[in-house]
Amino acid sequence: MIEAVALARELLRIPSVSRDERAICDFIEERLQGDGELSLARFENNLVARIPGSGPRVLLAGHLDTVPGEDRVFEDGEVLGGLGAVDMKAGVAAMCEVATRDLARDLTLVWYSCEEIDASENGLRRLAGAMPGLLNVDLAVVLEPSGGAVELGCQGTLRAKVELRGRRAHSARPWMGRNAISRAASLVDRVDRLEPRRPILGGVEFKESLSAVRIESFVANNVIPDSARIWCNYRFAPDLSPEEAAARLLDWLQPVLEEGDTVTVEDAVAGAPATMSGFEGLVAAAGSVRAKLGWTDAGFLATHGVPAVNFGPGDPLLAHSPGEVVAKAEIAGCVEALASWLAS
């Protein structure tokens, strides 16, 4: 049987930045091939394992890739550290141990590529297209780091570009023009003053946020700019559709918009509903439950009618940071909680 903590240590030594997951996928496939209970299928750098069983059909999903960063791996007492320790090689290792346990449920496990980059390359989406029936399951758990709590649903996310107009002039005579950067400052202030909605959904509280994440404006060092572009990211609760979120954003920005300004929604995806139905045993085993702040592939699964939660080892606040560390006890605890639920 695979032991998750030892496997996580090995996985941390295998670089797997997005689009470079072949080595880690090969490694996991080789480790699982000796288990006679598993039926394995490979598509590109994505791996699917199936275990027949009874009761509701469950899917566990975890991505193999990491963001770019330093490959230093370290171990300090009761923690493992390194790029991807939290996001999400600890969760990937936990899945591997669960796959070798004696379980009662009908189980599908998916290790997939390219989660950290553009959605068009996401391995889970590519698998769903290449393997009809893969998502014919009743429940799903995405093993994103959750600090050992079950996180229900996920937020939707919307990115909008706001273009503000000004009037160009020489910087020695700024009163002859209208500075689009000054207008942008007013818009950013408006963005920062949004009162976030905090709806209670499925018994947990979601907190929305709106942030300015990028700004551009330049003509020349001696020119008052006549345009400025600001990109905003709105993380909205899953009770709103992307269309409703876009309408709310536009309504909030309206007081600082003028004729000739434009707001373009460049990307918007729905969140996943917060539901505990079917996951009560997992919540009991984990010991705590809360809302998922952020978007995960639970949202993608929800669009296919699959209720999904997030549950994995590691503090999500450490993801993508140079200080990624995960407690060995948290990895083992994740395995035991999943195994307890799936054995029932």
Which sequence ranges carry the predicted segments?
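Fold-independent oxyanion-binding glycine-rich loops
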Residues: F43-N45, G62-L64, S113-C114, L139, ...
